[in-house]
Amino acid sequence: MSQAEFPITPEVEADLRIARRGCDELLVESEFARKLARSRATGVPLRIKLGLDPTAPDIHLGHTVVLNKMRQLQDLGHTVIFLIGDFTSTIGDPSGRNSTRPPLTREQIEHNAKTYYAQASLVLDPARTEIRYNSEWCDPLGARGMIQLASRYTVARMMEREDFTRRFKTGVPIAVHEFLYPLMQGYDSVALKADLELGGTDQKFNLLVGRELQKEYGQEPQCILTMPLLVGTDGVDKMSKSKGNYIGISESPDSMFGKLMSISDTLMWRYFELLSFRSLEDIAALKAEIDAGRNPRDAKVALAQEIITRFHSAKDAEQALANFEARFRDGAIPDDIPEVNLAGAPMGILHVLRASSLCASSSEAQRAIEQGGVKIDGAKIEDRSLQLNAGSYVLQVGKRKFARVNLAV
């Protein structure tokens, strides 16, 4: 029976909905549906690949978006391949860069890979995850094999990539070795005989190279699934340590809880879609309750507890909630406090205190901070240069002055 003849059953359609949830693109969807149908009919799991270059040892919630998708597909019974690009890391991925990315040393790669996988295992099921290193097949290629591989793809096709085109037009140098990165990543799919490859939206070109190379090597081409980049806690830029708008998965439960409670109500629903394992039906029902008048805080608490349970424990999640509520209770925050809407995030704390009428001047705000009299969401602050990203905050000055500040861009 050919792949096209396997029936698209209701179970296959349900699997396809899970794959599509929150994704940016699924190419080619009709092909992937047939792959799912074949897998259902034959009992042979699909080989689903996620390649990661361990360029940094720690990961945040933004990195887990694609890991969550891998876990969802893993739970459908498919084989998940967690590919560590120890070879390609020595080249340096130019994706989205305006300059050459420096390669890593073998020692850096080994350290980062161990730390990265240990954290990724909090999302993936280690018992059902195949770990591979692309040096297994890339190192033996040698010069002859590398040249033969390069002959499979043209410079014209390579220049279709936006960042290469931009750098070429603006006179920013492109090193020849940078062309090798997407080729080597594509060759990984050939070596692994991948049925589906996942990646961020910035990896689309590289994933398509893998699809084309599989055709060159006589294999059934993989489908590709790209996931969006998670917006950070500021509600503006993608989650990034450099932007200060990130939530690290190794942060303390209290820190994670506070940051998740600070995001805007609108952003909360995007986090539910990309970070929660709740069904879309459950999320829709919760949203309907909020729209009908239930406090959005209840939904944020549910989201925060789910995420903290995943990366710590249910007990830690309950304790983080208790600690969060205790900070407010001990601070004797009134039920009805003035609400202030401000625009211009990120905004300095001195400006926020002045604009919300909690302090008459910047000097008064500075003194209040130095004397330990300023709290944000129940936590005392000491940094007078603190910048607040977009979000909702409860500010307290002294024992009796409060304001709920909704800070927008």
Swiss-Prot record:
GO terms for cellular component: cytosol. It comes from the Bacteria. ATP binds at K241. Transmembrane segments: none annotated. This is Tyrosine--tRNA ligase. Residues 347-407 form the S4 RNA-binding domain. Pfam families: SYY_C-terminal, tRNA-synt_1b. Homodimer. It is found in: Cytoplasm. It comes from Bordetella avium (strain 197N). Belongs to the class-I aminoacyl-tRNA synthetase family. TyrS type 2 subfamily. Signal peptide: none annotated. A motif ('KMSKS' region) lies at residues 238-242. A motif ('HIGH' region) lies at residues 54-63. Keywords: Aminoacyl-tRNA synthetase, ATP-binding, Cytoplasm, Ligase, Nucleotide-binding, Protein biosynthesis, RNA-binding. The gene is tyrS. InterPro entries: aa-tRNA-synth_I_CS (IPR001412), aa-tRNA-synth_Ic (IPR002305), Rossmann-like_a/b/a_fold (IPR014729), S4_RNA-bd (IPR002942), S4_RNA-bd_sf (IPR036986), SYY-like_C (IPR054608), Tyr-tRNA-ligase (IPR002307), Tyr-tRNA-ligase_bac-type (IPR024088). One of its GO terms (biological process) is tyrosyl-tRNA aminoacylation. GO terms for molecular function: ATP binding; RNA binding; tyrosine-tRNA ligase activity. It catalyses: tRNA(Tyr) + L-tyrosine + ATP = L-tyrosyl-tRNA(Tyr) + AMP + diphosphate + H(+). SUPFAM superfamilies: Alpha-L RNA-binding motif, Nucleotidylyl transferase. Its EC number is 6.1.1.1. Gene3D superfamilies: HUPs (3.40.50.620), RNA-binding S4 domain (3.10.290.10), Tyrosyl-Transfer RNA Synthetase (1.10.240.10). Its main location: cytoplasm. Catalyzes the attachment of tyrosine to tRNA(Tyr) in a two-step reaction: tyrosine is first activated by ATP to form Tyr-AMP and then transferred to the acceptor end of tRNA(Tyr).
